[in-house]
């Protein structure tokens, strides 16, 4: 609403009868009759800001016209014809214009809702009134209750009822309270009998349902409707929610991972809402740092749900109405038991009042409040989570900038909002299912550039699920972008997938500790979970091998690939999960023959950790019992031993070109090395040659030429100590754990038989 409404009564008293006079005459008459405290400011406006005065006059005229229109509808003729009554059409257009431009106050919505549902006017008029019910701020719960009471009278048509339910679902988050509406749950449920109303009533019930609303007779009714109408998505949604609260009452199988149950009810009002947001758009706020404590977010000028501005935190019952004399005793008693969110300032305060907190009507406001994030994470109230996920899904879809071309100018606001979501997910150490659904829907449309950092961070927080289900929805599309993008994008994707693997492993490691492994149902579940993790690792291995070919064995890319396998090699020991997956040959041999010392050092460390994990797995009796379940076969040990033999041959025994490594003999002959088959070791390896030269120059600084082949015997041991002193800890761990120091050097492999 425009701010001029607050002085409406004063201006009405000062309005003169000189309607045909000029604006200056009217302003003079109004200026003389103002209070002395206000006259100075008003006079200043009149002298220095004539444009503002004209705008003020236009807004006041618009406000007056709206009041006249509302008064006309409130006292208007019964069953007036729209086509014949020009006055009616004039007032309808006035209401529509103001609603689309500024939104309507809660008092005006209260009056117009009663008019639309009371049947005073024709069906066409009622439809137009309902379509322009756009709130400026909030909608009063009492207005909704009175509107629902008109449905019992039966004076409005079926199409009007459908439109009202669609409006109620679309505006659900902007109703100031829900207690009285929830008491009408039985009435709404009875409306499921109407086939036209059923989808929208199901959606409303889905938003309202609490555990106490789930009754056996309602379950039977829903099952009867499903048998009559078939597997309708809206019925499945309500049944799924009922099954969550009372699994014993519902034995039928329901889809587990269905993403979309309801059609978007906001489509009718989308244009008007966008107009309100455009008019009231304020400057983009800076991203907020999520800290433990209340968030002091300054309210902005926006009057509608917008992703670029998180809703301001307001308790549904902490309003100015608490001081009104006409408030009922029951309302006072109900409100006295709840703790206002505005007064929540510290974590101890949260613990003391956790039993009497009342969450806000706009659930999106919890994103900026770490205390409320703690609350919804600990309490796990399903209706609360459903409300939050519904809000998040709708707003992500509304504001995603690559869905709509005209939204690119708001890219910074959308980016800031995604940053807020990511901070909340990091704070909770858990991903939101609404973001997962958003990724599945938007990835095919994503160009790989817009909001890249935020998008890939959302990928890393996808909740754990079956890889086979996620792959066609996400990873297949991601692979197409991966192969056709720059090396920097490839590295970003690998980093994101490493974080995704870490989050999945943390979730599974916590889950396995909360439940006994000896329970047979869990064994099956854990085996399936390990299979999903294994498929994710193999998927990254496939991406990495192909990327190395595309990027000509780029060292920068190889660093990110080995970072991923540093996480993979320690799954068994660090996360206590029965899984060991080796890297593919294309990655192993690329790293082994790399010219970069840090790459080879990193490979040595990974091989050392693989050895530790496989040795621990071999000794563990639990793994022996569940060997077939978790695929700890001799093939894994044989593959590791083969890698180990190749590494020792390249770094220690000077026998590199055995099984697994092939280089064209013509290329080897061009190197000019006489006995190339016996020349590659820790001294002659291309990545260590500079170290060998530096070592020899330290011993004999006066020498003009050096012979690296002279490093043998005692010099060999001194040279190793020199390498270890240069920070090559991976090489040090590998040689000390995997090389047998004797007169005949050989690799210390792992016995792949059942007996260790």
Swiss-Prot record:
Q: How is it modified after translation?
A: Sumoylated. Sumoylated form can be polyubiquitinated by RNF4, leading to its degradation. Desumoylation by SENP6 prevents its degradation.
Q: Which UniProt keywords apply?
A: Centromere, Chromosome, Nucleus, Ubl conjugation
Q: Which Pfam families match?
A: CENP-I (PF07778)
**Its domain of life?**
Eukaryota
Q: What is its main location?
A: nucleus
Q: Does the keyword Ubl conjugation apply?
A: yes
Any one Gene Ontology BP term: sex differentiation
The transmembrane residues are none
Give the record's GO CC terms.
cytosol; inner kinetochore; kinetochore; nuclear body; nucleoplasm; nucleus
Location of this chain's protein in the cell? Nucleus; Chromosome, Centromere
InterPro entries in the cross-refs: CENP-I
Q: Could you tell me which residues belong to the region Disordered?
A: 1-60
Q: What induces it?
A: By follicle-stimulating hormone (FSH).
- Please explain the role this protein plays, according to its UniProt record: Component of the CENPA-CAD (nucleosome distal) complex, a complex recruited to centromeres which is involved in assembly of kinetochore proteins, mitotic progression and chromosome segregation. May be involved in incorporation of newly synthesized CENPA into centromeres via its interaction with the CENPA-NAC complex. Required for the localization of CENPF, MAD1L1 and MAD2 (MAD2L1 or MAD2L2) to kinetochores. Involved in the response of gonadal tissues to follicle-stimulating hormone.
What family does this belong to?
Belongs to the CENP-I/CTF3 family.
User: Assembly and interactions?
Assistant: Component of the CENPA-CAD complex, composed of CENPI, CENPK, CENPL, CENPO, CENPP, CENPQ, CENPR and CENPS. The CENPA-CAD complex interacts with the CENPA-NAC complex, at least composed of CENPA, CENPC, CENPH, CENPM, CENPN, CENPT and CENPU. Interacts with SENP6.
Which PANTHER family does the UniProt entry name for this protein?
CENTROMERE PROTEIN I
Q: What's this protein's name?
A: Centromere protein I
Q: What organism is listed for this UniProt entry? A: Homo sapiens
